[in-house]
């Protein structure tokens, strides 16, 4: 694990603590404070926020490990990232997990496969041996995963869902109780459906189960969303994340709707 500052001190001094179902566990992890040019790894997993990714890739560019798995929420294509760290090194992905670090303890959990497995795929959709190697690692680690032919489309579709979900928290005076706000649930359902319809019109909507959400009556979807927000799943994977990362979600909100606006104008010109 590459860590710096206070987090490095915590890991070196106390190990990695994580919260299980009934108790807190400790595991020893090997830590490094820098990535040296001659260090060699089969995969480098990059798990930073989008506004930190280019700086991180600048550091990685000095190292010659062949595969950089970018587990990052983004709407941008991957060309600029490849220019920074080298063409052919980026393997775009997104984790099927959620949680946060509180008091130095990791409180996180894998998402069920039916909701969102860890997702990855080669740029351009080609098959590769490193895809198979990464899939093998996930299988041996009992991490649900899926390989998709167009990761950029998947990430746009993901943002079309998650941004309205996060926006609802920020619009409420009582974000911990939004499940009871029928008007806000209806508005969130409407926004989500509108996003997915636009993405589908552009031929980018995936996975296929999102078509069911797109075509669901708004009132029915609002009821489903209310139950999701009220659930332990909603608390762990939606509420905590939104409350810990408002700036990230606000930036993604702006980038997503700017993307829609720009590509709508381009379509109208054509």
List PLM regions with ranges.
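Short, charged/polar "capping" segments at the starts of alpha-helices
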Residues: 7-12, 76-79, 128-130
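NAD(P)+-binding Rossmann beta1-loop-alpha1 motif at the extreme N-terminus of oxidoreductases
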Residues: 1-26
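NAD(P)-dependent Rossmann-like dehydrogenase/reductase catalytic/cofactor-binding core
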Residues: 193-196, 200-270
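Rossmann-fold dinucleotide-binding core
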Residues: 79-158
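Generic structural signal for well-ordered, non-membrane alpha-helical segments
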Residues: 127, 131, 184-192, 245-253
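Helix-loop-beta segment of a Rossmann-like dinucleotide-binding subdomain
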Residues: 107-122, 170-180, 232-243
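Active-site-proximal catalytic alpha-helix in oxidoreductases
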Residues: 152-196
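Rossmann-like NAD(P)(H) cofactor-binding subdomain of soluble oxidoreductases
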Residues: 23-107
């Amino acid at each position: 694990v590459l860590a710096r500052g206070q987090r490095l001190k915590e890991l070196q001094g106390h190990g990695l603590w994580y919260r299980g179902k009934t108790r807190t566990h400790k595991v020893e992890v090997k830590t490094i404070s820098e990535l040296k040019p001659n260090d060699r790894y089969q995969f480098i997993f990059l798990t930073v926020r989008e506004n930190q990714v280019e700086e991180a890739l600048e550091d990685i560019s000095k190292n010659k490990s062949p595969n950089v798995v970018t587990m990052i929420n983004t709407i941008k294509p991957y060309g600029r990232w490849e220019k920074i760290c080298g063409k052919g090194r980026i393997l775009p992905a997104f984790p099927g997990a959620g949680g946060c670090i509180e008091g130095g303890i990791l409180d996180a959990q894998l998402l069920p496969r039916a909701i969102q497995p860890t997702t990855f795929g080669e740029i351009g959709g080609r098959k590769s041996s490193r895809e198979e190697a990464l899939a093998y690692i996930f299988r041996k680690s009992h991490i649900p995963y899926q390989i998709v032919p167009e990761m950029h489309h998947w990430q746009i579709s993901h943002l079309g869902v998650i941004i309205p979900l996060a926006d609802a928290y920020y619009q409420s005076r009582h974000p911990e109780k939004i499940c009871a706000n029928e008007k806000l649930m209806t508005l969130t359902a409407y926004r989500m459906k509108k996003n997915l319809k636009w993405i589908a019109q552009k031929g980018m909507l995936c996975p296929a189960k999102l078509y069911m959400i797109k075509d669901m009556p708004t009132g029915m979807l609002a009821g489903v969303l209310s139950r999701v927000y009220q659930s332990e799943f909603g608390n762990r994977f939606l509420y905590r994340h939104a409350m810990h990362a408002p700036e990230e979600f606000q930036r993604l909100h702006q980038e997503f709707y700017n993307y829609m606006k720009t590509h709508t104008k381009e379509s109208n010109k054509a």
